[in-house]
Amino acid sequence: KGMALLDIGCGWGYLLIEAAKKYGVKGVGITLSAEQCAEFRHRIQAEGLEDSLKAELMDYRDLPKSGYTFDRVVSVGMLEHVGRPNYQLFVDCVNDVLKDGGIFLLHFISALKEHPGDPWIKKYIFPGGMVPSLREMLCCLSEDNFHTLDVENLRLHYHKTLLCWAKNFHKHLEDERKMFDERFLRMWNLYLNACAA
């Protein structure tokens, strides 16, 4: 209760809202998306959590000069957007704002070994994205003296997640057609189903 929690790549803010409601954390979420930041701020207000949570439009590289310090740091599904040349910088920035004895939870999609990634996904789905290997992330973390306490492989869970996303995608296809062209919709459908396979 009362711990300071940072969510790097907080998206729409659900993780922090639940943590504030269930565990009484004081949290900050950072994102590069102005739309997500605005919606997260709206949700903070709607939940009456203005004294507990803050949404910031901020790059993780600006954390060291932010003046913030945290007991806990989480990052869920954002590392893939950092890029291999910046993995160590990312870990360094976390280290700069994490209090001594703090805990860092890093959730990411990983590969068995380092590779450049799927060319189609890199071109059409996640330009600039990169899937790190567990080995290279453990090396980066050890450079800042992080001690790995647990590693969990969620591969089978993610298969189910992708199938749910694909089902939801098809359920709302008519609404999506108002926002995206058929080419994009076919690509997104292929991406979800190919990754689930």
Which stretches of residues belong to each language-model region?
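Conserved SAM-binding loop
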Residues: 40-41
